[in-house]
Amino acid sequence: MNYYLGLDVGGTAIKMGLFKETDELIDKLNFPTRTVEYLVDDIYQNIINLFNKNSINIDDLKGIGIGFPGHVDGETGIVVYSNNLVAHNFDIVGKLKEKINTYIRISNDANVAALGEFHFGKGKDFQNIVFVTLGTGVGGGIIVDGKMLEGKNGAGAEIGHMVISTNGHLCSCGRRGCFETYASATALIRNARVAMINNPTSLLWEIAESPEKLGGFTFFEALERKDKVATIIFEQYIEDLADGLTNLANIFRPDALILGGGISYRGDVLMEPLQQRLEKMIYGGQWNARVELMISELKNDAGIYGAYAMCSKRKK
């Protein structure tokens, strides 16, 4: 039996999934992300631990796929730039191959998550999808005709940095009005905190006690209790998110837009008004084929499934 590993490298933790060649996920683990000088050793040691735990010979490992945040050159295996992990021109594939002689492929983490959803999640019945993650920022991956769109040197598909509001909020990238400054979970809570300060009678004060304590759960509790301030903030959030998704739908005309990240799991409170707005705004409207709006099936495991798909040499 041949085995493969899918790795999803995050800013605080690394997820590792052990797969059989039959697509079965047989075990997974998480371990803390340390600075880059420790990264390869940490990955290697956890690979050994995982194989020993499952009584599998390391020689049966036929491939490793890695999703890594930032600008990643999949052809050379080099992390060109990763702000989250402070890694510049980091040859992670070369260093890991010095320890384990197997096929290794790497790509941007959001692209890899899209590949996972395409092969094993809600995208498996389609050939064209746009996968959008709503978290600390806005990430995403694009599958066109069954292939992952990475752009030159793997630097493409940075959908969180398309501008939806000229001279809008300042983004960490240095531009103003980027999609992620409006549609991320961070943006939603930022706006809610400002509104909370300006509205001392809002239920947000009763539920969260202070702006600093306001988070996703407390915000959505206020929304469920029909707090007026939370409702106004969320309606504006839907509009901003719909603006960006409409741009993506008009450019790529995918079979489906698939949303991941914690906010997407809120279900109908998000999806129903978002679908309605998209149908009104998409170019051609009722005269063009419907773009399906869906919630990720794989959720937090999309990255490891995509990394597995990438290294097991599937169509990509």
Predicted regions and their residues:
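Short beta-strand segments
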Residues: 8, 65-69, 131-137, 141-143
